[in-house]
């Protein structure tokens, strides 16, 4: 009798633990963040293709798309472009681009976007006309409110000197943010010295014209928009009960996948205080942006790694980044076929590398683990909705 009682207690404990695990997974808030980096967007594009392929296999659904699994998808610069590609609906209300169409998009359009240089000292390096044309052709008249999941795309208004964050959740309060996706994409990619700033207008809540004068989102949020994406997810908690689990920044209830576009710890050349002591504006201008982007991305990753680990949820955060780019792969505007092929190889090789010195798990294994969590969570929510 005692043995039977002990056995029943054990079963109850197992069921309770299992139930708690699944409940926790069901409540997870999922966030995807994609860095800026111009043509280097090929690297996260390669990673996204792998991830979406895994989700399709796990769910036995060739039509499965990343927007079906993430509550918030955020990006800046080329990351904003990728965000739009995988969240903007087509005529069937599905993402107009599958993940395996991202890299071919760069190969087809990259050489034309980064072409027709107009001279870097007396104007932007590129006129941006082809970029705007291809965005209009692919994104059409779609606006922010039509995105298939919550988005977080950053830009910076040089007239008001304030960052502008385009999200669905802000539209009720600020309808002027319901801009056309092609205007948003061009704006977040309009890196100073590379492309001209972008001017366009929308309507305010009173029907008045509201004007934007925007440049690259990296000016507002640095190249890594992970913190921005988290803040948008957190704000959703104030309005949607489904996000209640992160109202107090409970990172145990959040899955964050952050994709970088690659950096190098050496910047191709190192410098000493002595040799830079007499540098002027031009010398610093040639290297400071790369240094700043790399340093800020490192600090964002350091902060997120620390807070997730502090809540014993380090497995919930995955930063996929190549830190050893060399040669032309470090350039954001080298759209030669040879360099683009090299960037694809960087992405594919990255999948085989360990996540860190302390974590022998490869990025491929980590992404498969993430895919399993995303798949299971989607099924749990679908089952709950059917009752």
UniProtKB/Swiss-Prot annotation:
The keyword Translocase does not apply. The active site is at residues 77, 216. The nitrogen atoms of the two glycine residues in the GGXR motif define the oxyanion hole, and stabilize the oxyanion that forms during the nucleophilic attack by the catalytic serine during substrate cleavage. A motif (DGA/G) lies at residues 216-218. InterPro entries: Acyl_Trfase/lysoPLipase, PNPLA_dom. Its EC number is 3.1.1.-. This is Patatin-08. Keywords: Coiled coil, Glycoprotein, Hydrolase, Lipid degradation, Lipid metabolism, Plant defense, Signal, Storage protein, Vacuole. A motif (GXSXG) lies at residues 75-79. GO terms for molecular function: monoacylglycerol lipase activity; nutrient reservoir activity; phospholipase activity. Belongs to the patatin family. GO terms for cellular component: vacuole. Probable lipolytic acyl hydrolase (LAH), an activity which is thought to be involved in the response of tubers to pathogens. Residues 32-230 form the PNPLA domain. Tuber. Residues 361-385 form a coiled coil.
């Amino acid at each position: 009798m005692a043995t039977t009682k002990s056995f029943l207690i054990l079963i109850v404990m197992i069921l309770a633990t299992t139930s708690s695990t699944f409940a926790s997974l069901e409540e997870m808030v999922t966030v995807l963040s994609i860095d800026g980096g111009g043509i280097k967007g090929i690297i996260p594009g390669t990673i996204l293709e792998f991830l979406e392929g895994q989700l399709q296999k796990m769910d036995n659904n060739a039509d499965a798309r990343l927007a079906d699994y993430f509550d918030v998808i955020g990006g800046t610069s080329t990351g904003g472009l990728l965000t739009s590609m995988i969240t903007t609906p087509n005529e069937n209300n599905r993402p107009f681009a599958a993940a395996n169409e991202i890299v071919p998009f760069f190969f087809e359009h990259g050489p034309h976007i980064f072409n027709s240089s107009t001279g870097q000292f007396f104007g932007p390096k590129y006129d941006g006309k082809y970029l705007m044309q291809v965005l209009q052709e692919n994104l059409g008249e779609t606006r922010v409110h039509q995105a298939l999941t919550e988005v977080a795309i950053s830009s910076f208004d040089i007239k008001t000197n304030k960052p502008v964050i385009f999200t669905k959740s802000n539209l009720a309060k600020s309808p002027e943010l319901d801009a056309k996706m092609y205007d948003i994409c061009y704006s977040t990619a309009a890196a100073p010295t590379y492309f001209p700033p972008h001017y366009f207008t929308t309507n305010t809540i009173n029907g008045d014209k509201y004007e934007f004068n925007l440049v690259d989102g990296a000016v507002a949020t640095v190249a890594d928009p992970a913190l921005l994406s988290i803040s948008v997810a957190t704000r959703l908690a104030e309005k949607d009960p489904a996000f209640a689990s992160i109202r107090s920044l409970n990172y145990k209830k959040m899955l964050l996948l952050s994709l970088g576009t690659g950096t190098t710890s050496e910047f191709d050349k190192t410098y000493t205080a002595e040799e830079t002591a007499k540098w002027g504006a031009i010398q610093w201008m040639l290297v400071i942006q790369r240094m700043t982007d790399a340093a800020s991305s490192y600090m964002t990753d350091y902060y997120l790694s620390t807070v997730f680990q502090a809540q014993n949820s380090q497995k919930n955060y995955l930063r996929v980044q190549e830190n050893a780019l060399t040669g032309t792969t470090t350039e954001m505007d080298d759209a030669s076929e040879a360099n683009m092929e090299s960037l694809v190889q960087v992405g594919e090789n990255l999948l085989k590398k360990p996540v860190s010195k302390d974590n022998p798990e490869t990025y491929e294994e980590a992404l498969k683990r993430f895919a399993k969590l995303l798949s299971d969570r989607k099924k749990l929510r679908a089952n709950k909705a059917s009752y």
